């Protein structure tokens, strides 16, 4: 399968419509039937898909409309977790932090229904399914059962592996593991790497790994050891500085973050064009995907949309220049290709 050179994608989350946030609150209070909530989620999913498509994104997602939060969604569906209540993250942001109180088991699909709905309702051939990785789920949960972190993380890796196999069996072609916490503790990075490799064991489709706001020089030491097709990393927030760690990236793709998801300022098309060309100092264009730094959910929806629009406009400008050199397409690589 071939894609246009410099395929554009998203990382995962997107601002939820205000009416969907109200539905989440009503559901939490037990004031609406579950079928009404599900209908609202599906409507929001289609609305966000259309925004991504209208912006021109090649490989969209629905902005995680089905998910209340990136770890809570998964821990709520994995047997062995228990919720005690909300935990403050920063400012006025809270999430329900789960505790492992028994052996963790895969009791039901985690995102299968979500994927099938998105695939049915998109006009694009490929969608990217983001899934929170095993190390981050463990890092952002309490452990009240396992004797050590390793056994906790590796049981989660086995559960994620079952979900990836379920998705692959149902036609998913591109999955992204989100591991924003994997570099929190340098001495535990080998454990995170082992967990990622266990999670993708037996998987043949395309798998990306998203890591953000971390020491990428530490990650670069493991580029060759991590069995993924692509590393989706943030660069706009760090103003595209200190990128020499990319010299260690070979034989795998880079998802190049070109818009800052923590800054409401909308990057200009020219700024994004210059950023993309800077990446060419490290990788050939055929090994680059273009995406935001991270999930866009913390931004105003109109700002998030315009950032995507400008990202796509910039890519189209660079594509035209590359096409003059006879470089118009890129291969859709999978784990079988690395």
Swiss-Prot record:
One of its GO terms (biological process) is methylation. Its EC number is 2.1.1.-. Transmembrane segments: none annotated. Binds 1 zinc ion per subunit. SUPFAM superfamilies: UROD/MetE-like (SSF51726). Zn(2+) binds at residues 210, 212, 234, 294. Its cofactor is Zn(2+). Keywords: Amino-acid biosynthesis, Metal-binding, Methionine biosynthesis, Methyltransferase, Transferase, Zinc. InterPro entries: Met_Synth_C/arc (IPR002629), MetE_arc (IPR022921), UROD/MetE-like_sf (IPR038071). It comes from the Archaea. Disulfide bonds: none annotated. Pathway: Amino-acid biosynthesis; L-methionine biosynthesis via de novo pathway. It is an enzyme of class 2 (transferase). GO terms for molecular function: 5-methyltetrahydropteroyltriglutamate-homocysteine S-methyltransferase activity; zinc ion binding. Pfam families: Meth_synt_2. NCBIfam families: PRK04326.1 (NF003317). Catalyzes the transfer of a methyl group to L-homocysteine resulting in methionine formation. The physiological methyl donor is unknown. Belongs to the archaeal MetE family. This is Methionine synthase. It comes from Pyrococcus abyssi (strain GE5 / Orsay). The gene is metE.
């Amino acid at each position: 399968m071939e894609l246009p050179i410099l395929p554009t994608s998203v990382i995962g989350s997107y601002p939820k419509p205000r009416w969907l946030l109200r539905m989440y609150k009503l559901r939490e209070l037990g004031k609406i039937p579950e079928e009404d909530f599900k209908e609202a989620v599906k409507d929001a999913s289609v609305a966000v898909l259309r925004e991504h498509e209208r912006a021109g994104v090649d490989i969209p997602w629905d902005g995680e409309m089905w998910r209340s939060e990136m770890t809570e969604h998964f821990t709520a569906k994995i047997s062995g977790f228990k919720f005690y209540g909300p935990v403050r993250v920063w400012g006025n942001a809270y999430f329900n932090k789960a505790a492992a109180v028994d052996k963790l088991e895969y009791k039901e699909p985690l995102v299968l229904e979500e994927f099938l709905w998105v695939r049915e309702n998109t006009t694009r051939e490929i969608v990217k399914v983001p899934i929170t990785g095993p190390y981050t789920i463990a890092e952002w949960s309490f452990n009240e059962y396992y004797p050590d972190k390793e056994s906790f993380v590796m049981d989660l890796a086995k559960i994620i592996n079952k979900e990836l196999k379920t998705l692959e069996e149902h036609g998913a072609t591109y999955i992204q593991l989100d591991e924003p916490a994997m570099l929190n503790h340098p001495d535990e990075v080998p454990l995170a790497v082992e967990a990622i490799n266990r999670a993708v064991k037996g998987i043949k489709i395309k798998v990306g790994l998203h890591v953000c706001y971390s020491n990428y020089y530490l990650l670069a030491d493991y580029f060759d050891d991590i069995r993924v097709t692509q590393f989706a990393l943030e660069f706009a927030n760090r103003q595209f500085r200190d990128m020499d760690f990319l010299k260690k990236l070979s034989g795998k793709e880079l998802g190049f973050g070109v818009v800052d998801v923590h800054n409401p300022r909308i990057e200009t098309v020219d700024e994004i064009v210059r950023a993309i060309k800077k990446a060419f100092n490290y990788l050939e264009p055929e090994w680059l995907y273009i995406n935001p730094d991270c999930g866009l959910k913390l931004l105003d929806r109109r700002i998030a949309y315009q950032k995507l629009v400008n990202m796509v406009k910039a890519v189209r400008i660079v594509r035209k220049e590359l096409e003059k050199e006879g470089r118009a397409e890129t291969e859709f690589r999978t784990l079988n290709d690395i």
